Amino acid sequence: MAVPYTKGMTIEVSKLVDNSVVAWLPAFVVKTFWKSNLLVDYTVSNSDGTALPEEIVDVKHVRPCLPQASAISFCINDEVEAFQGGGWWLGVITDVHPELKCTFKSAHLGVEVQWSQKLLRPR
């Protein structure tokens, strides 16, 4: 079986904590290895500004970049991803506000933050 990703392709790589996906980070494919591994270079940095190192990942932790959602209305309890710090973080909508804003609760940290709907996408 061929790897469905090719050199130079833009992808998203899952960030795992305790074997659970907490975020998807943008990267591009540097090289394919064997039948199911990729060398990836992240397009985001650590919070201190240092670059994330290239990494070999299994394709089961990779997905194509999702298209930007437009004009989506969210409801309470919708499972979504919120864009912050260069990556897409998993969570749920806990409140909907006027002016296209929602309160987003991070699945990983449990913190609630008010977010513009432009920075949210369905999961």
Stretch-by-stretch model annotation:
Residues 1-123:
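Eukaryotic chromatin- and chromosome-associated nuclear factors
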